[in-house]
């Protein structure tokens, strides 16, 4: 269900704005999107796992907040990230 350290490192390298950047909104949204995708696959076989579903909803909410912040502060970065991750917006 969780992402591997190698995959997380690859996501950070792909979306980082500078070397060693792990806290920017782009990196955080990319990691959350990966975790959301993994949990979505999990729910295809475990439909009654409501405990994990709550975690999924919290992750979606956190990602939405980060995207709203990014949209408000820098529309260009927001648009590029949405296109790169293939999110509907």
Swiss-Prot record:
This entry's Gene Ontology molecular function terms read: rRNA binding; structural constituent of ribosome
Biological process terms from the Gene Ontology for this record are: translation
CDD domains annotated for this entry?
Ribosomal_S15p_S13e (cd00353)
Organism of this sequence: Caulobacter sp. (strain K31)
* The protein's name in its UniProt record: Small ribosomal subunit protein uS15
Q: Which GO terms describe its cellular component?
A: cytosolic small ribosomal subunit
The entry's family comment says: Belongs to the universal ribosomal protein uS15 family.
The record's Pfam families line, in alphabetical order, gives: Ribosomal_S15
What is the role of this chain?
One of the primary rRNA binding proteins, it binds directly to 16S rRNA where it helps nucleate assembly of the platform of the 30S subunit by binding and bridging several RNA helices of the 16S rRNA.
Q: Which HAMAP family match?
A: Ribosomal_uS15_B
- Tell me the keywords, alphabetical order: Ribonucleoprotein, Ribosomal protein, RNA-binding, rRNA-binding
**Self-association state and partner proteins as the record states:** Part of the 30S ribosomal subunit. Forms a bridge to the 50S subunit in the 70S ribosome, contacting the 23S rRNA.
Q: What broad taxonomic lineage does this protein's source fall under?
A: Bacteria, Pseudomonadati, Pseudomonadota, Alphaproteobacteria, Caulobacterales
Check the record and name the InterPro entries matching this protein: Ribosomal_uS15, Ribosomal_uS15_bac-type, uS15_NS1_RNA-bd_sf
The answer to whether UniProt assigns keyword Membrane to this entry is no
